[in-house]
C-alpha cells in the first residue's frame, strides 16, 4: 500500500483516497460559495446593531437565525405549533411502516429508565418480533446533553438463535408545562428522524459478530441521513 489511507479505505465505501478527494473537490466550491453568502447576511445583521466586528464561530447561530427571519420571514417559533412531539414521533413510525412494512406498538409492562420514557415493540411486516425501541425525549439531571441512538442489548446470536435488539433513542427536547404539548423546532424534528434512522439500522441488523454499527465506518451515518430526507416530504 502506498500509504495508510489506501490500506484503511480498501474495505470501506470510498475504496481509495482518490475517491475521497474527488468527493471533497465536488462539494468544496459550492459549499464555500454558500458559506460566504451566509456570512455576508450575518455581517449585515451585525451592522444593523451598529457593531463593527466580523462574525466569529460563536456569533453564527444567533445572527444566522436573525438573517433567516429577515431574508425569508422565517421565525422558528412559528413553526413549532405544527410539530407536536407526539405527531413527529407518529410520523417517523408512519414513514417506517410505509417504507418497510414494520409496526410499533407501545408496551406498558417493561421497566423504564424514567417515567417520561416510553417503550415500543417493533414487528416486521410478517408479524415477527424485530426488537424493542425505547424513546427518552426530555432532559434531566442524570442525562448528558444532545441526541443519540444506543442499545441496551445489541442484536446477536446465542446458541445458534437470533437475539433481538433493545434499542434506545435519546434526545433533550424542552419538556412542556403540565397539560401542554411538547413542540419541536424544524431542526429538532429533523434530529428525531436522524436518530430514528440509526434505530432502524440497529433493529434491522442481522449479524453474528459485535461491532459499533457492524458496517464500514463511512456507512455509519447513511441510514440516519437517509431517514432525515423524509422529515419534510409532503406525502
Could you say what each language-model-derived stretch is?
Residues 9-13, 178, 204-212:
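Short, flexible helix-adjacent loops and helix caps
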Residues 118, 167, 187-189, 222:
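Residue-level detector of short, conserved catalytic/binding motifs and their immediate flanks
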Residues 110-114, 196, 216:
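A short beta-turn/loop motif at secondary-structure boundaries
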Residues 96, 175, 180-203, 224:
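Active-site recognition of the HExxH zinc-binding catalytic motif
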Residues 2, 197-210:
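Catalytic Zn2+-binding segment of zinc metalloproteases
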Residues 1-175, 229-235:
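Active-site-proximal, well-structured secondary-structure segments within enzyme catalytic domains
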Residues 81, 85, 178-189, 212-216:
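Alpha-helix N-cap/helix-initiation motif
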Residues 129, 205-235:
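Acidic/histidine-rich catalytic neighborhood
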